[in-house]
């Protein structure tokens, strides 16, 4: 593996790396926006910060589809680049656009099954917007959208207990026939969806990319099945 440094908002810094690529993967995103973090850290008043964090819409960058060749993505909000619209949506659309220019056979995007509790709905809405735009605008490139719930890994210690709690909620919801998630509506979000280890999602992504018939969204159950399929291949 070779590591390269690039700026996701500046396509010119990574476009040369896409030449001849078999696959391109977008795995970057933000869970909390800068203004939301400001409220939690006390740097901004709860009223002003939360009103902006939970606004129905924000601007991302200029339209990534009509930007000039090599033009950087320019944040349109005073919050800077840390909005769902820019980091979760526009950066993915731009990377897909650059990959399509290089006739990359397949593109994978790590999306999400739902927004976690207390996270603005725009978190998952912008991911769905990225999925639909990439599918519509780049039909000649096989695009895959993995939709995991909460992802965890031992390298990020704080995610392990959160995954355990989410796992319990998932089992309770399953045992109740989905009543828990249904009663609380969209509030529970990914808290009632089985958490997945990051390695499982990565294994599934590789397996999906290697299957030329595979395209479109892949939900949690299928992610697990693909990961197991890849694991079994590795054992042969």
Regions found by a protein language model. Give the residues of each.
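Extracellular-facing segments of soluble proteins and assemblies that are Gly/Ser/Thr-biased and enriched
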Residues: 89-113
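SDR active-site strand-loop-helix element
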Residues: 27, 107-113, 146-148
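Residue-level signature of transmembrane alpha-helix interfaces in integral membrane proteins
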Residues: 36-38, 45, 104, 163, ...
């Amino acid at each position: 593996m070779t590591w390269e440094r690039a700026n996701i908002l500046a396509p010119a810094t990574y476009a040369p790396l896409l030449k001849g690529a078999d696959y391109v993967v977008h795995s970057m995103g933000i869970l909390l926006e800068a203004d939301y973090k400001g409220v939690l850290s006390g740097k901004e008043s709860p009223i002003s910060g939360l009103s902006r964090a939970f606004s129905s819409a924000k601007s991302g960058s200029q339209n990534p589809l009509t930007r000039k060749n090599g033009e950087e993505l320019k944040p349109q909000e005073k919050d800077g680049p840390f909005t769902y619209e820019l980091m979760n949506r526009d950066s993915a659309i731009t990377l897909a656009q650059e990959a399509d220019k290089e006739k990359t056979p397949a593109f994978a995007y790590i999306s999400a099954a739902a927004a976690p509790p207390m996270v603005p709905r725009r978190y998952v809405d912008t991911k769905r917007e990225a999925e639909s735009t990439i599918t519509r605008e780049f039909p000649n490139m096989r695009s895959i959208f993995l939709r995991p719930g909460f992802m965890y890994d031992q390298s990020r210690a704080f995610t392990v207990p959160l995954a355990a709690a989410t796992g319990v909620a998932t089992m309770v919801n399953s045992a109740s026939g989905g009543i828990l998630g249904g009663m609380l509506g969209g509030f529970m979000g990914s808290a009632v969806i089985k958490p997945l280890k990051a390695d499982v999602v990565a294994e599934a992504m590789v397996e999906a990319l290697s299957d030329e018939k595979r395209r479109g969204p892949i939900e949690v159950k299928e992610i697990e099945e693909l990961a197991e399929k890849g694991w079994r291949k590795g054992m042969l």
